Amino acid sequence: INSKSSKENNKAWISRYALIDDYHKIINKKLKSLMEIIKLDYCEDINYKIYVDTGPLLERAYSYQSGLGWFGKNSCLINKDLGSWFFISEVLINKKLEYDQPVKDMCGSCTKCIDSCPTGAIVDNKKIDANKCISYLTIENKDTIPSNFLKKIGNNIYGCDICQEVCPWNNKKAKIKNNFNWNLRDFFVSPELDKILQLIETQWDEVKIKSPIKRAKKRGFLRNILIAMGNSKNSYYKPKVQKYLKSDDKILATTAKQAILLMES
């Protein structure tokens, strides 16, 4: 997915992984097919359980221990060939296998991810302060966005990829065959703010089907769009924001007020 964060103030930004169908289900289906082939053709007595960020498994830690990559300063797992643009999944089996050893950290003295984080969410020892992370604030946080982060949210309406986009390991194109049908949703790629607002207002129930965006819920998505409109400084959006001042939803009403202040500041 060749999508870069848009700098245009009339465009919104949605994290890359949310531009496609829910990866949990896609990968789970692929792994199940793979294991059934192995079971049928190679090892009848194999038992397995699949995880795609779907259970209490320390995926990143196990991936590191198995040599898939090293932890970058932004805490993402980085592979020397793939960068950090990949999903992690696991298959637990009742067989012993040989496995690779952990690889060395190859970030060196680079601090691009730390320097580029708008909210300063990347702290020491490759840890993230979730309360400052734009991905957390726009997806997991169900309340209003803290006032000290409003401007820093920018035009991010679902997630944030900044610390990965600036990573030098993500600059090269991975040479890997991709036979997954991810079903790219073009209307999520740098959408115009007024169009994505209308889409979420009128077609949320259809848009959220098979999409990870449902995790933010409709209210969260609308909240994020209002903030992005405020940060655009574009008075064209003012009437669209103002109508939410009278919303029965206190979070949206408060956010609309915040967005107007952002627009006028």
Locations of regions flagged by a protein language model:
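C-terminal amphipathic alpha-helical segment
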Residues: 146-181, 206-214, 220-221, 227
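Structural detector for internal amphipathic alpha-helices that build alpha-solenoid repeat scaffolds
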Residues: 222-232, 254-263
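Auxiliary alpha/beta "docking" domains used to position bulky ligands
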Residues: 1-106
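Short inter-helical turns and helix N-cap capping residues of alpha-solenoid HEAT/ARM repeat scaffolds
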Residues: 218, 248-250
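Glycine-rich phosphate/pyrophosphate-binding loop
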Residues: 186-221
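Amphipathic alpha-helical scaffolding segments comprising HEAT/armadillo-like alpha-solenoid repeats
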Residues: 203-207, 234-245, 265
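Short, charged low-complexity linear segments at domain edges
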Residues: 78-102, 130-149, 200-205
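Iron-sulfur cluster-binding cysteine motifs and their immediate structural context
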Residues: 112-136, 142, 156-180, 240
